[in-house]
Amino acid sequence: MSDDDHHFESSADAGASKTYPQQAGTIRKSGHIVIKNRPCKVVEVSTSKTGKHGHAKCHFVAIDIFNGKKLEDIVPSSHNCDVPHVNRVDYQLLDITEDGFVSLLTDSGDTKDDLKLPADEALVKQMKEGFEAGKDLILSVMCAMGEEQICAVKDVSGGK
């Protein structure tokens, strides 16, 4: 055996799962669920009683947290569903580039330059107007299943 046999390529992903299992019957409204491989927020849950052949079923109506599309799924209540790990992180806005990207300041003092402006026109307008007025803006970034998107803007200027 040579040393090459024990060599592996490291990647940025540490191999942590992007989802965790949860029994369908325990997922509630305003929780999260993966439907059609998309992270969603549950807006409605209804349960049907056990029928002649089998399990009680949970009917989930959910909204994709990144694109706002409505998705539905029906799962036996005793089965496990994938639930995404959803995180929200706040960053300070440093710059908005011409090509539609933002430059953000992380807690550790580094810059994060790989995030595009969101599709929400009102949010983009709020960001651009605040930035041009010289306000200190904090952007909330939602992260789930390897995707990131700006979801909120806060002005922390303090009466400038």
Swiss-Prot record:
UniProt xrefs under SUPFAM superfamilies: Nucleic acid-binding proteins, Translation proteins SH3-like domain
Q: Spell out which residues are annotated as carrying Hypusine.
A: 52
SMART domains recorded for this chain? eIF-5a
Protein keywords: Hypusine, Initiation factor, Protein biosynthesis
Which one Pfam family would you cite for this protein? IF5A-like_N
**Listed Basic and acidic residues bias regions:** 1-10
Record-level GO BP terms: positive regulation of translational elongation; positive regulation of translational termination
Q: Where is this region: Disordered?
A: 1-23
The source's domain of life comes to Eukaryota
Any single GO molecular-function term of the entry would be: RNA binding
- Sorted alphabetically, which Gene3D superfamilies does this protein's record hold? 2.30.30.30, Nucleic acid-binding proteins
Processing and modification events after translation: Lys-52 undergoes hypusination, a unique post-translational modification that consists in the addition of a butylamino group from spermidine to lysine side chain, leading to the formation of the unusual amino acid hypusine. eIF-5As are the only known proteins to undergo this modification, which is essential for their function.
Q: Which family does it belong to?
A: Belongs to the eIF-5A family.
Q: Which purpose does this protein serve, as stated in its record?
A: Translation factor that promotes translation elongation and termination, particularly upon ribosome stalling at specific amino acid sequence contexts. Binds between the exit (E) and peptidyl (P) site of the ribosome and promotes rescue of stalled ribosome: specifically required for efficient translation of polyproline-containing peptides as well as other motifs that stall the ribosome. Acts as a ribosome quality control (RQC) cofactor by joining the RQC complex to facilitate peptidyl transfer during CAT tailing step.
Q: What is this protein called?
A: Eukaryotic translation initiation factor 5A
- The source organism is Dianthus caryophyllus
